[in-house]
């Protein structure tokens, strides 16, 4: 009985220790949070991203970019969706932190409608996050 419990635990442990899919990057700058938010809003279209939500009071912005050129050997696969989630906040000493999370989703067309499955962040979304931070670092 004990060996079955131990074997079950050993088999489930790797499933619980998965790596996070999102790629997080951050930077600190001397500009005010409002100015950093304006910079992010200005730079996102230059990177090909479309703003999908904005919380001006909390200095958060989300943007999406669709990759319709990606192909998979699955008839239900539709496209890849790259998302940038940016959160800006004041830090001690008058600095402002800019935190960017890049995420990639595979969008499938199923019987219940469009379904997104999160994948490891693509190189494209990681590159866009780095370029965004470099442009808005000040």
Please provide the spans of the model-predicted regions.
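Ser/Thr-rich, low-complexity intrinsically disordered terminal regions
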Residues: 17-138
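C-terminal motif of bacterial Sec signal peptides marking the signal peptidase cleavage site
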Residues: 13-15
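Sec-dependent signal peptide recognition
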Residues: 2-9
């Amino acid at each position: 009985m004990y060996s079955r419990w131990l074997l079950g635990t050993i088999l489930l442990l790797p499933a619980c220790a998965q790596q996070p899919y999102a790629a997080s990057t951050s930077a600190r700058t001397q500009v005010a949070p409002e100015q950093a938010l304006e910079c992010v809003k200005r730079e996102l279209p230059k990177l090909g991203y479309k703003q999908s939500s904005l919380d001006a009071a909390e200095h958060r912005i989300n943007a999406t970019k669709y990759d319709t050129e990606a192909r998979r050997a699955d008839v239900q696969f539709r496209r890849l969706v790259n998302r940038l989630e940016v959160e800006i906040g004041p830090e001690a000493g008058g600095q402002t932190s800019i935190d960017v999370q890049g995420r990639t989703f595979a969008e499938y067309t199923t019987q219940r409608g469009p379904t997104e499955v999160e994948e490891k962040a693509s190189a494209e979304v990681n590159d866009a996050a780095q370029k965004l931070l470099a442009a808005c670092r000040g």
